[in-house]
Amino acid sequence: GMAEAAESVLLVTDHVVGARSISDLGAEVDDDVLDQLWSQLQRAHAAGLAHGSIDASSVVVDESGRLWLLDWASGETISTELSRRVDLAQALALTALAVGAERAIDAASRSLTTAQLASIAPMLQRVVLPRQTREVMGRRGASRQVLQDLRDALVALTPTADAEPA
């Protein structure tokens, strides 16, 4: 739950038993788990929240297959459109590393509007991604290619998208 006192906000969560990072699960991640990520992110954004640092340590799956979006310390309680777009780009890049660009785009397409998808393309650049995600991309030697593949797929899906970095 979340509570406010004066100018402070307190967020209390459950301990997640058997949590495994979405990145560690890789191909084991099913479409339901991907859909849970996008659904949780949309609910947070609708409530005015932005996460700010979506990486492998903040997206975990418990023993029952339930996805948890953790580590909201870098988040915003009165988020801007830009910070919400950053969240979307971070989530898309993270899921692409875990399950591949095609499945990541398919999952995002099931939950996001065409306008939201189009807004992600220019945000897909290394500087927008959390350090941990950039490091994983670098270790795989895939940094620029993964981001370019995602931008290309978004432009193909939403031809009005501007894929040039913002």
Each predicted region: which residue ranges?
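Short beta-strand micro-motifs within the conserved protein kinase catalytic domain, predominantly
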Residues: 1-8
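Conserved catalytic motifs of the protein kinase core domain
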Residues: 8-9, 65
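Short pocket-lining segment of the protein kinase catalytic domain that shapes the ATP-binding cleft
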Residues: 11-19
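Conserved hydrophobic "DFG−1" position in protein kinase catalytic cores
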Residues: 15, 60-61
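Short small-residue beta-strand/loop micro-motif enriched in glycine and branched aliphatics
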Residues: 19-25, 77-78
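Conserved kinase catalytic-core helix
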Residues: 22-57, 67
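C-lobe/activation-segment region of protein kinase-like
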Residues: 51, 62-64, 68-134
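Regulatory N- and C-terminal appendages and interdomain linkers associated
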Residues: 120, 126-166
